[in-house]
Swiss-Prot record:
Family: Belongs to the neurotoxin 12 (Hwtx-2) family. 02 (Hwtx-2) subfamily.
Covalent S-S links between cysteines: 52-66, 56-77, 71-82
Pfam families in the cross-refs: Toxin_20
Propeptide: 23-48
Transmembrane helix listed as a keyword: no
Chief place of localization: secreted
Localization annotation: Secreted
Species in which this protein is naturally found: Cyriopagopus hainanus
Protein name as catalogued: U4-theraphotoxin-Hhn1e
Lineage, top ranks: Eukaryota, Metazoa, Ecdysozoa, Arthropoda, Chelicerata
Tissue specificity field: Expressed by the venom gland.
GO molecular function: toxin activity
GO cellular component, one term: extracellular region
Entry superkingdom: Eukaryota
Length: 85
């Protein structure tokens, strides 16, 4: 019984990870189809990093917990930086 449950949960986890990776690849390929050069993608990444860092610092100075509002679209705020989720 335990082995079956572990196998089912493992398969479900692999399926979720595979689906997430496939969605990221599809989104990246759509960006590249539009013709956005790598330099523009890097600029977007730097902008998100800056926005997240500034947002976290402002909230920390106000003695509030850092809420990760600025990072969206597969990004999350970690250590005052937006990182790919």
């Amino acid at each position: 019984m335990k082995v079956t449950l572990i196998a089912i949960l493992t398969c479900a986890a692999v399926l979720v990870l595979h689906t997430t990776a496939a969605e990221e690849l599809e989104a990246e390929s759509q960006l590249m189809e539009v013709g956005m050069p790598d330099t523009e993608l890097a600029a977007v990444d730097e902008e998100r990093l800056f926005e997240c860092s500034v947002s976290c610092e402002i909230e920390k100075e106000g003695n509030k917990d850092c809420k990760k509002k600025k990072c969206k679209g597969g990004w999350k705020c970690k250590f005052n930086m937006c990182v790919k989720a």
